[in-house]
Amino acid sequence: WYPLGYNIRPKRLQTIAREAVAQYGGQLPSDEETLLSFKGIGAYTAGAIRSFAFRERAAILDTNVARVLFRVFVGRGDPKSHAMKKHLWRLSETLLPSRHVFDFNQALMDLGAMVCVARSPKCPACPMSKSCRSVKLNR
């Protein structure tokens, strides 16, 4: 539990909840800057809150989304490098549709969790396989 940060998450959630009650009447704000001011809320969580709770146009980049974007659009290199993460964030923001962002973000997360998995990805079942850089580079 400790290496994954699971031990601290409940405490951070309690702190965020207390701050939301004290300063915002129990409601989380929807603007990115304010969300990022909460200790324990980073770029991914702020984007997820804005996208899923408020249906706003906000990019997300969790492990699954990063894997999908890296494989489909990049294919080679170190997906965990700082420069690559910045590139993947920009890509995530660029690809956002103007409407149905909730569905788009959820679909990317699901694709990474169920098809474009870390080990033994199910490339033949992937709707992106025909344009996937990783598939093309590994043939």
Regions found by a protein language model. Name each.
Residues 1-124, 128-138:
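Catalytic cores of DNA base-excision repair glycosylases
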